[in-house]
Curated annotation (Swiss-Prot):
Keyword line: DNA recombination, DNA-binding, Transcription, Transcription regulation, Translation regulation
Disulfide pattern: none
Origin species: Paracoccus denitrificans (strain Pd 1222)
Gene Ontology BP terms: DNA recombination; regulation of DNA-templated transcription; regulation of translation
Protein name: Integration host factor subunit beta
Similarity remark: Belongs to the bacterial histone-like protein family.
Record flagged with keyword Iron-sulfur: no
Matches recorded under HAMAP family: IHF_beta
Subunit structure: Heterodimer of an alpha and a beta chain.
SUPFAM superfamilies: IHF-like DNA-binding proteins
Entries under Pfam families matching the protein: Bac_DNA_binding
Function recorded in the entry: This protein is one of the two subunits of integration host factor, a specific DNA-binding protein that functions in genetic recombination as well as in transcriptional and translational control.
GO cellular component, one term: cytosol
Length: 95
């Protein structure tokens, strides 16, 4: 599912809301998650999961084409850990 499909689905399930308002809400939620992570904060959506940022240390890598050793800089990467309810639902344990 892509963002526009998510917006469409929410609009269909909430006919009292205009689609442009749903789009604004969805975009705001995503922006707030991104902003919080950029500040180094953890975003927890209870039952769904938690978004956080992990630091990957600098290291020596290898160019797969040439075999040459290359230096890979330290970087921060987004990380998502699923919540218990999401894991249970995906594994059919909530029935």
């Amino acid at each position: 599912m892509i963002r526009s499909e998510l917006i469409q689905k929410i609009s269909e399930e909430n006919p009292h809301l205009f689609q442009r308002d749903v789009e604004r809400i969805v975009n705001t939620v995503f922006e707030e998650i991104i902003d919080a992570m950029a500040r180094g904060d953890r975003v927890e959506l209870r039952g769904f999961g938690a978004f956080s940022v992990k630091k990957r240390d600098a290291r020596q890598g290898r160019n797969p084409r040439t075999g040459e050793t290359v230096s890979v800089d330290e970087k921060h990467v987004p990380f998502f850990k699923t919540g218990k309810l999401l894991r249970e639902r995906l594994n059919g344990l909530d029935e």
